[in-house]
Amino acid sequence: MSVIDTEIAVDIVKIYAAWLERFGDVLERRAVGELVDLFDDDSYWKDVLAFTGGYRTFGEKPDIARALEATIDGTAPKGVRQAKGRTAPRLVRRSAKWVIEAYFDFDTSVGTGTGFVRLLHDEADPANPRLWILLTTLQELAGLEEGVGARRPSGLEYSHSFAGDNWADQRRKAQERAGDHPEVLVVGAGQAGLALGARLSQLGVKTLLVEKNAAVGDNWRNRYHSLTLHNEVWSNHLPYLPFPDSWPAFVPKDKLAGWLEAYAEFMELNVWTSTQFLGADFDQAAKQWSARVRRSDGSIDVIWATHLVWASGGTSGVPNIPNLPGLADFDGPVIHSSSFLGGNEFSGKKALVIGTGTSGHDVAQDLHSNGAAVTMMQRSPTCVVSLVPGGTLVYAVYSEGPPADDVDLVTAAIPFPVLQNSYQYLTKKTTELDRDLLDGLKARGFKLDTGPDRTGFHMLYLRRGGGYYINVGCSELIAAGEIALMQHDEFETFVPSGLQTRDGSTRDFDVVVLATGYRDQQEGIRDALGEAVAERVGTVWGFDDNYVMSNMWQRTGQENFWLAGGSLLDCRLYSRFLALLIKADLAHVALPETELASTRYDSSGLTSIIGAP
C-alpha cells in the first residue's frame, strides 16, 4: 500500500467512526426522524431477524421511517460500536458509486447483532457521507451463544477420568442415542443439512441428520464422472471450517464429497447414513413430529422431534420426467441426468440428450469425450456464459480479500433493485465478452436467452434454479458441429429405434438422457408428508414478497417445519439465521415481530439504469 493509499484508508476510518457515533446516538435515542435524515433519498434498509424477526427490505425514506417506527421500541437497539474482528472500513466502487463499506455491532432486547453499511462518499463533502444501504442482522441470542472461540469447551474432562469413557467412546454413544427424541431432525446430510447441523450443534441443540446414501458426500460422489463446481472455492466455505488455501479454485465433485464426509466427522455431527426417511406426522397438541425412518438393516424406527428440517436438495429434489410421446416405446436405456455417472459405457453409441441447461451440457460433453455421437435437443432458450471471466464475475466480491463471513453480509445487504441493476450490467458485460462464442451458437440454431429482465444466469438460478449453462467447453463443441443440435419443435414422437421428426424422417439413437431438471420441492414434500403439509408450505424457491427464496431458511406455513438448501454459499450464509430461529423457538425467546411487508418493487425489469445488452 502506498503512502497516499494509507492516508486515504486512515481518512476513511476516521470518517466512518464519526458517522457511526452519530448513527449510534440517534438509534439508541430512538429518534426516528433524525435517523432517517442520515439516509440518502434513494436508500434501502434490509433486516434479518434483528428488528423484524424475519427478512424484510424497506426502500426510500417514507417506508424506512414507517418500519423504524413500528420496530425500534420492540428491538431496543443500543451499544452501537465498531464491529470486533471485522474488515476495516474501506472505500470501494459499487454500482458506479464510490461508497464506504463498513460493519458495526449492536445489542438488542434479545441478543447481539451485526450491521453493514454502504455510505455514499462525496469528495466535495467527505465528512458527511449519506447512508445508501443499511443491513441489520441478529447474530447471537443473549445467554445462548455459540460454543466457539473463547467459549469453546476446554476438553479437560477427557483427561480426568482414566477409567471412564474417552472422547471416542462418548461420540460413539452419542451417535447411537441420537434418535432418542432429538430436538431437531434434519432430512438430508448434503451441504445444507451439514451446515445447519453444525450451527445447531454449536448452539447446543440436540440434532440428528438422516441420509439415504451410504456415506456423507455421496450426493456429490455419485454424480457424473466429470462434474466440477462452477464457482470458485473462496465463495464455497462451510461454517467454522474453511477449505485449505492449497485447494483448486474449481473443486472436483469427489474432492468436495470427501470434504463433506470429513466435515461431518470433524464437526461431531450425528448422522445416520443408509437411512431412508419414510414420512412424518405432526402432533398439533404436543407440538412434536413423529417421523418414520428405515435403517440399513431394514428395521423401521420412529423418531420424535420438535422440529423437522427438509434439507434433501434445495432446488434439486425429485427428478422431473417429462411425458414425451412414444418414450415408452424406445428400445434403448432412458436415464435422468441425476442417475448419469459417466459416458464411458456409451463409446461409439448414438446419444440424445434432452435439455440444454448445465446438466445437459455437461452430460453431452462427457458423452462426446467418451466417443459417443451426441445430439442435444433444446426445449427452451438457454442463458450461456463462459466460466472465466463471465461466470465468476457474480462471485468477484469473494475474491477481494475480506473473509467469507464478512462478504456474506455484503451479499445479504444487496436490495432487489440494486441486485437487478447489477446483474443487468454484468449480463451486458459478459454478453460482450462472449460475443464470438454466442454468435457461433446462434449460427448453429441454438436459442439464447438472458432472462425476462436481462439479468442473466444467476438471477435465473434464484428465480427458477435453472435455465442456464456456465460454459466449460461444450458450447465450442456445439458451435463447431461436433455435438449436433435439434429443437424440440422438430420432434414428433419416439420410436423403438430413436425418434421421428415432424417432417416424417427418423433419427436413430442408442440411449436417451433426460437433462430435464427437477420437480418443485413442494412435490417432494407432498410425497413424504402429504397433501395438507405441502399445501401449507406452498411453493419452494424463487423470490417471495420479501425478496428472499420462497420458504427457504425461514418460517413456513407448517408449524415447526423448515426447508434448507441451495449452493454452498447459500448454506453458509443462511444456516446461521435458521439455527437462530430454531434455537429461539426451543428456548422460548420471543423475537421481534412486525406485520409490515417489504417495499414492493417492479420485478419485471422494464426500467433500468443501463441499456439493453
Q: What are these regions, as identified by a protein language model?
A:
Residues 2, 103-173:
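Short beta-strand edge/turn micro-motifs at domain boundaries
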Residues 15, 25, 29-96:
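A solvent-exposed, acidic/Ser-Thr-rich amphipathic alpha-helical stretch
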Residues 1-41, 170-182:
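Short, low-complexity N-terminal intrinsically disordered segments enriched in polar/charged residues
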Residues 137, 205, 210-212, 254-352, ...:
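Flavin (primarily FAD) cofactor-binding/catalytic cores of flavoenzymes
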Residues 61-106, 226-296, 464-484:
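N-terminal Rossmann-like dinucleotide/flavin-binding domain of flavoprotein oxidoreductases
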Residues 157-182, 335-347:
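A short, basic/flexible loop-to-alpha-helix module at the beginning of a structural domain
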Residues 175-210, 358-368:
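N-terminal Rossmann-like FAD-binding beta1-loop-alpha1 element of flavoenzymes
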Residues 221-258, 381-448:
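Glycine-rich active-site loop/strand segments that organize a redox cofactor
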